[in-house]
Swiss-Prot record:
The lineage of its organism: Bacteria, Pseudomonadati, Pseudomonadota, Betaproteobacteria, Burkholderiales. F-type ATPases have 2 components, CF(1) - the catalytic core - and CF(0) - the membrane proton channel. CF(1) has five subunits: alpha(3), beta(3), gamma(1), delta(1), epsilon(1). CF(0) has three main subunits: a(1), b(2) and c(9-12). The alpha and beta chains form an alternating ring which encloses part of the gamma chain. CF(1) is attached to CF(0) by a central stalk formed by the gamma and epsilon chains, while a peripheral stalk is formed by the delta and b chains. It comes from Paracidovorax citrulli (strain AAC00-1). ATP binds at residues 174-181. It catalyses: ATP + H2O + 4 H(+)(in) = ADP + phosphate + 5 H(+)(out). It is found in: Cell inner membrane. The record marks 378 as: Required for activity. This is ATP synthase subunit alpha.
Amino acid sequence: MQLNPAEISELIKSRIEGLAASSDIRNQGTVVSVTDGIVRIHGLSEVMQGEMLEFPATKDGQPSYGLALNLERDSVGAVILGEYEHISEGDTVKCTGRILEVPVGPELVGRVVNALGQPIDGKGPINAKLTDVIEKVAPGVIARQSVDQPLQTGIKSIDAMVPVGRGQRELIIGDRQTGKTAVAIDAIIAQKGQGVTCIYVAIGQKASSIKNVVRALEQAGAMEYTIVVAASASESAAMQYVSAYSGCTMGEYFRDRGEDALIVYDDLSKQAVAYRQVSLLLRRPPGREAYPGDVFYLHSRLLERAARVNADYVEAFTKGEVKGKTGSLTALPIIETQAGDVSAFVPTNVISITDGQIFLETSLFNAGIRPAINAGISVSRVGGAAQTKLVKGLSGGIRTDLAQYRELAAFAQFASDLDEATRKQLDRGARVTELLKQPQYTPLPISLMGATLFAVNKGFMDDVDVKKVLAFESGLHQFLKTSHGALLERLEKNRAFDKEGKDEAELTQAITAFKKSFA
């Protein structure tokens, strides 16, 4: 068969036109070494800091991802998120072009998830409609609003003396076994019916401890508005490091839509240790206490994201869907100290970043004063502006009584005979100290807390035996609930005494009536 040149060129042209040339340009590299969850990769020329890298799937077909942290001249250092036993030298690694993301939204509420937002509670998949990046820039000064709304923790000593406002960062610091987690869990339980979504991030905790926390939240009915992000001690250092940022992103979803959220980081000491481990394995130069140079930035960029944002920010973010509402993310980071040393590297860093701190002391805890809060050195730098009028008006005397009591108690040890005024102050201080004790998982509503503070401030407890103070308080609460429910409802609603003085008169009358019946 004879073909002329014109036919040949037509044939080639038609073949070229009919060719389905689908090309997939991907930036990929090769694994050079794998050690302790750290992978060195050669050939990833267009990778971003913090980008998700796709590794070969696990034996059961689950996708495997890593996080690019070290960008060097001829190689990339990455941490594997999850299992790494199946990865070997020579494996292909692909760029995804995406920064690490986690699912966000109301679908996560009531669930227990890992650091990547994957469910680990056995209640089925989470069908979240949205995802968001874990690393974000915190809202600027213009987008913020001053903290002036209270976040009630239900704990007498905190709400009276170191109040927390919505959008504040209040550090809980103390040695191990001083009740730090208990304070945070009580604060979460106290948000029931307050319209606050809570996120509890467990970093480096024992799996059994996390299970106990979840059980306590379920029994109190608090899981209905809580997300638990768990990175237990058995998980990799990378997962423990990432978990705090994942939880923060989940909280920001609510903040940016004009809602209120509370996040607890339990605890940031273990997150810093996990980050130190990752940094040392990546051969980054160590600094003080072998922590890397950016350990301050590790916590500052996390805690600065807790803020109260103004209505303009919320309106711009939601594209006009939500108007006239401010949003807030309140943070309660926890730091564990060694033998009460608050001047160590990580504690001083976090103290300088936060808006105040609640100090818990072993000596107080062992003396039976629980929560073991040292009111003398605990402060709230911005919460005073957010404190409810009811508690603010009554709490000034409490702090003064305690301060004078501590001063006189030390002096009274050496004095044999004390004058009447000193004895009165010592007696009042002993009763206030006793009154600030509170059982775990029993946060108080604002009305009952106000009644308690009113009773001690007006001297109704001065002649009650110290050992019977707590019995007097619980009896008074029960009496008010049964006989003066309307008064409690008014105090709960108005969060202040009325200007005419009727509420104060009724409360005085009620306490006097109860005291006559109290044996």
